[in-house]
C-alpha cells in the first residue's frame, strides 16, 4: 500500500512532486488473514483424509509386490497337499518358474484312508513305484500304542537270555527298613507329586526299593562268573564267604542297656552341675581390693626362668679395661676435638696467621680518579674462638645423668 501525507489537489503540479518525493510505502503483515474465513478443523479433517489415501496406496503396492514374489516362490500353505478321506491318487509335479524344486515342495501330507501318492520330480523320467497300502483301520494310532506296550518286558521279568540269578546273597529286610522304603516311595520319582511326566504318583507301594530299579545283588563281577556254592578255606579268587555270616557276627545291642546308660549319664551331669553351685554359695565373702589382689597373685602360676649363675672362673678371652688408660687417651685426643673438619696430610693452614682486617678497601672521593682522603685501616687483633665444646665425659654423672 502507498499512503500520501499531503491531500490531493489535481490542479497543482507541486502536489505531484510532493507525492513522488515525500511518499512512504507501508506493508501490512496481517493482510493475508483478513480474507481467511475457513475453520481450522476443516484443515485437520483434510489432512486425515490424505493420510488414509496414502496408506491405501502403500497397502496396494505391498500386495502387488507380494503377488509377484508368490509367482516365483509358493507359500508354505500352498506347498502342503492335505488329502482327507477314501482312496485317492495324488500326482504332484512341483515346478516353478525358475525350474528349481525345493525340498518342502516334495513333501506330501496324507491323513487317514488308503492313498496312492505319486511324486514326479523334474529330474526323473518315470514316477516311483506305488507305496504299500496301509490296512484300513480307524484306530491306527491306538493300535501302535498297544503294540509298543506289549513289547515292553514286565518289571522284574526273568529274561530267557540271562541266567537264573542265585538267591544265595539275598537277605530279608527288617520291617523298619521296609517301612522307610514305603515312606520314601510315596514321594514319587524325580518330579514329585505331579501326576504326569517322570515323577507322578507311585506305581507300586510294595516290593520296590528306593531307587525304583531292579535290585542288584551284592557281589563284584558279572552274573556268569559267580559260583552257586560258597567258598571256604581262604584260597582262590572271589573268596568272600556269605553275607549272612557277616551280619550274624554283628550283635544287636539291647535297648535296655542303652536306656540305663542314658539314665546314668543324666544323673552324673546333674551332680556335676550341683557341686559348683554349692561351692559358689559358701565362698561369697567381703574383702578389700588389696586382699583380692594378693589372693590373685597367690593363685597365679609363677613363671620360672632358667637363669645362669655367675661363675668364679674368668673366661680366657676376657679383657680388662683400666680406667687410667682410658683417661690418658682422652687427654691426648682433646686437641683433635677442636677441629670438626677433615684436613689433608699436607695442610699448612693451621701454621699460618691470616688476618682479613688488613685488606685495603676502595677509597671514597669525587670524580672517577679515586681521589680523596685516604682512610687509614686499623689492624684488629686475631681472636681465636673455640666453636666446639669439650666432649662429655661418660663417667661424669653431671654430663650423663641417666647413666649414673
Swiss-Prot record:
InterPro entries: HABP4/SERBP1-like, HABP4_PAIRBP1-bd, IHABP4_N. It comes from the Eukaryota. Pfam families: HABP4_PAI-RBP1, IHABP4_N. Residues 1-21, 51-288, 359-379 are annotated as: Disordered. Keywords: Cytoplasm, Nucleus, Translation regulation. Residues 8-19 have a biased composition (Polar residues). GO terms for cellular component: Cajal body; cytoplasm; cytoplasmic stress granule; nuclear speck; nucleolus; nucleus. GO terms for molecular function: ribosome binding; RNA binding; translation elongation factor binding. The keyword Cytoplasm applies. Residues 71-81, 145-159, 165-184, 205-233, 270-281 have a biased composition (Basic and acidic residues). Gene3D superfamilies: 6.10.140.1040. It is found in: Nucleus; Cytoplasm; Cytoplasm, Stress granule; Nucleus, Nucleolus. Residues 188-200 have a biased composition (Gly residues). The keyword Cell division does not apply. One of its GO terms (biological process) is positive regulation of translational initiation. Disulfide bonds: none annotated. Belongs to the SERBP1-HABP4 family. PANTHER family: HYALURONIC ACID-BINDING PROTEIN 4 (PTHR12299), INTRACELLULAR HYALURONAN-BINDING PROTEIN 4 (PTHR12299:SF30). Ribosome-binding protein that promotes ribosome hibernation, a process during which ribosomes are stabilized in an inactive state and preserved from proteasomal degradation. Acts via its association with eef2/eEF2 factor at the A-site of the ribosome, promoting ribosome stabilization in an inactive state compatible with storage. Plays a key role in ribosome hibernation in the mature egg by promoting ribosome stabilization. Ribosomes, which are produced in large quantities during oogenesis, are stored and translationally repressed in the egg and early embryo. Associates with ribosomes; promoting ribosome stabilization. Interacts with eef2/eEF2; promoting ribosome stabilization. This is Intracellular hyaluronan-binding protein 4.L. It comes from Xenopus laevis.
Amino acid at each position: 500500500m502507498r499512503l500520501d501525507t499531503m491531500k490531493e489537489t489535481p490542479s497543482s503540479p507541486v502536489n505531484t512532486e510532493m507525492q513522488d518525493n515525500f511518499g512512504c510505502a507501508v506493508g501490512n503483515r496481517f493482510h493475508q488473514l483478513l480474507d481467511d474465513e475457513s475453520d481450522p478443523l476443516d484443515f485437520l479433517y483434510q489432512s486425515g483424509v490424505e493420510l488414509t489415501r496414502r496408506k491405501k496406496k502403500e497397502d496396494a503396492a505391498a500386495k502387488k509386490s507380494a503377488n509377484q514374489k508368490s509367482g516365483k516362490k509358493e507359500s508354505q500353505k500352498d506347498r502342503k497337499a492335505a488329502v482327507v478321506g477314501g482312496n485317492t491318487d495324488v500326482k504332484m509335479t512341483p515346478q516353478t518358474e525358475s525350474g528349481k524344486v525345493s525340498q518342502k515342495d516334495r513333501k506330501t501330507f496324507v491323513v487317514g484312508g488308503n492313498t496312492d501318492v505319486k511324486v514326479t520330480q523334474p529330474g526323473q523320467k518315470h514316477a516311483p513305484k506305488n507305496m504299500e497300502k496301509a490296512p484300513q483301520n480307524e484306530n491306527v494310532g491306538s493300535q501302535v500304542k498297544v503294540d509298543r506296550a506289549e513289547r515292553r518286558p514286565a518289571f522284574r521279568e526273568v529274561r530267557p537270555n540271562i541266567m537264573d540269578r542265585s538267591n544265595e546273597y539275598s537277605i530279608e529286610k527288617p520291617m523298619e527298613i521296609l517301612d522307610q522304603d514305603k515312606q520314601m516311595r510315596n514321594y514319587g520319582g524325580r518330579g514329585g507329586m505331579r501326576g504326569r511326566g517322570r515323577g507322578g504318583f507311585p506305581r507300586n507301594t510294595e516290593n520296590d526299593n528306593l531307587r525304583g530299579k531292579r535290585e542288584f545283588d551284592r557281589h563284584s563281577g558279572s552274573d556268569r562268573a559267580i559260583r552257586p556254592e560258597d567258598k571256604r578255606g581262604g584260597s582262590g579268587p572271589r573268596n568272600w564267604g556269605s553275607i549272612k555270616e557277616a551280619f550274624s557276627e554283628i550283635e544287636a545291642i539291647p535297648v535296655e542297656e542303652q536306656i540305663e546308660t542314658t539314665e546314668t549319664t543324666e544323673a552324673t551331669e546333674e551332680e556335676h552341675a550341683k557341686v559348683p553351685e554349692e561351692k559358689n554359695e559358701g565362698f561369697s565373702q567381703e574383702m578389700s581390693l588389696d586382699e583380692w589382689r594378693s589372693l590373685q597373685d597367690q593363685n597365679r602360676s609363677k613363671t620360672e626362668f632358667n637363669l645362669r649363675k655367675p661363675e668364679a672362673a674368668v673366661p680366657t678371652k676376657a679383657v680388662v679395661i683400666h680406667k687410667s688408660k682410658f683417661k690418658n687417651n682422652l687427654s691426648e685426643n682433646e686437641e683433635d676435638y677442636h677441629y670438626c673438619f677433615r684436613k689433608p696430610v699436607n695442610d699448612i693452614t693451621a701454621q699460618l696467621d691470616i688476618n682479613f682486617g688488613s685488606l685495603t678497601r676502595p677509597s671514597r672521593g669525587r670524580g672517577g680518579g679515586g681521589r680523596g682522603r685516604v682512610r687509614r685501616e686499623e689492624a684488629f687483633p686475631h681472636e681465636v674462638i673455640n666453636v666446639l665444646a669439650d666432649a662429655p665425659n661418660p663417667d661424669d654423672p653431671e654430663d650423663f645423668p641417666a647413666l649414673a
